Amino acid sequence: MTRADFIQFGAMIHGVGGTTDGWRHPDVDPSASTNIEFYMKKAQTAEKGLFSFIFIADGLFISEKSIPHFLNRFEPITILSALASVTKNIGLVGTFSTSFTEPFTISRQLMSLDHISGGRAGWNLVTSPQEGAARNHSKSNLPEHTERYEIAQEHLDVVRGLWNSWEHDAFIHNKKTGQFFDQAKLHRLNHKGKYFQVEGPLNIGRSKQGEPVVFQAGSSETGRQFAAKNADAIFTHSNSLEETKAFYADVKSRAADEGRDPSSVRIFPGISPIVADTEEEAEKKYREFAELIPIENAVTYLARFFDDYDLSVYPLDEPFPDIGDVGKNAFQSTTDRIKREAKARNLTLREVAQEMAFPRTLFIGTPERVASLIETWFNAEAADGFIVGSDIPGTLDAFVEKVIPILQERGLYRQDYRGGTLRENLGLGIPQHQSVLHSSHH
């Protein structure tokens, strides 16, 4: 298997979005996070754009300070099951935690979704970093970082073991002889580990794609190692081309060290493209959104990087002030970059504060510009594909209608779906049943 021939995309559907004040935009439906129509429309738009999958993020704890989307939203397995019935080819990926679920339940839910959708299910495996999540699951505290990954490894091994309970042709349904299944093709797990004791077998068989695709998003040392060993696909951030390229090379070489074919691991940085017919229009879309964050909050946020220096004494709409070396000890590289950018682009204090509070994406501008950036990242081996966020209304539609055709013209993007399963559309093979892999040891 070689590197994917085509760039691939996943669409993150995130209700009212990932910011504190985005819901106040006139075009945003403030109930989007629990509006099934909103999710269906987004999923269908992504499918029209031949995206490989849609992605539903999740969390297990909120407080009064959480962003609006977190306060009131769908749980992934139910919304993905609903979306399965209004889509045909697009993958359905959801976040589930290994710290607060039973492997039997997760393996069953995901395999059910895989059957409902005809082989389109994916699991974004997380270990849940919040103390509050422990308190919502009858646990007094959260296991520490390394232990959470130990639990995750055993949890995933059990889930994959359960997915191998039945061989793909175990159910023979012979009405004449009355034989419903072939007993030799049923395997009981009998797992007894440090964290889980699971007998099995699972009460649902293999799916059209064998088993769901496993995604992971660890960027810590432990997280990268875990992802390189276990994941079919990996999510990451896209702060800069150099940084993302380094992450890509690092994870692929770790996968090779684990004895895996590095090209069987797909890497997806997250981007939030803002596309418009002119640079000015794209900039205006960005500003409209950035301006929703109260300017006082944005200036206070910016001041954090400058030792909480009082920036409110400076006029907002004049060039960014010269404040000397304030903040040098705490965030030197960040403050240097802020000052450099402000000078080079002649930004006002207001603009600098807005860009820090609602980061300005690299992927902004005309369709040609955004398509070329995507091409550059793909060719530079920083990505096999991208997770596309679309907090700003209309941005997913614009991307599908204007950027996708350019990528198709350049021979970088498919003209049609390869098949109906998520594995086919990611260019990944169907995993062999474990009985085949282990038969040489019997």
Curated annotation (Swiss-Prot):
Classification via Pfam families: Bac_luciferase
Phenotype of gene-disrupted mutants: Reduced growth with methionine or methionine sulfoxide as unique source of sulfur.
Signals that turn on the gene: Induced when methionine is the sulfur source, but not by sulfate.
Enzymatic reactions: (R)-N-acetyl-S-benzyl-L-cysteine sulfoxide + FMNH2 + O2 = N-acetyl-S-hydroxy-L-cysteine + benzaldehyde + FMN + H2O + H(+)
EC number: 1.14.14.-
Superkingdom to which the source organism belongs: Bacteria
Swiss-Prot/TrEMBL keywords: Flavoprotein, FMN, Monooxygenase, Oxidoreductase
Keyword Flavoprotein attributed: yes
Record pathway: Amino-acid metabolism
Binding residues annotated for FMN, in chain numbering: D58, T95, H145, Y149, S219, S220
InterPro entries membership: Diverse_substr_monoxygenases, Luciferase-like_dom, Luciferase-like_sf, NTA_MOA
Any one GO molecular-function label of the UniProt entry: monooxygenase activity
Keyword Glycoprotein listed: no
Quaternary structure and interacting proteins, as annotated: Homodimer.
Role played: Involved in a cysteine salvage pathway from S-alkylcysteine. Catalyzes the C-S bond cleavage in N-acetyl-S-benzyl-L-cysteine sulfoxide leading to N-acetyl-S-hydroxy-L-cysteine and benzaldehyde. This pathway is likely important in the catabolism of alkylated cysteine generated by proteolysis of alkylated glutathione formed in the detoxification of a wide range of electrophiles. Has much less efficient activity with N-acetyl-S-methyl-L-cysteine sulfoxide as substrate.
Family note: Belongs to the NtaA/SnaA/DszA monooxygenase family.
PANTHER family listed in its UniProt record: ALKANESULFONATE MONOOXYGENASE-RELATED, C2H2 FINGER DOMAIN TRANSCRIPTION FACTOR (EUROFUNG)-RELATED
Protein name as catalogued: N-acetyl-S-alkylcysteine sulfoxide monooxygenase
Organism field: Bacillus subtilis (strain 168)
Gene assigned in the entry: cmoJ
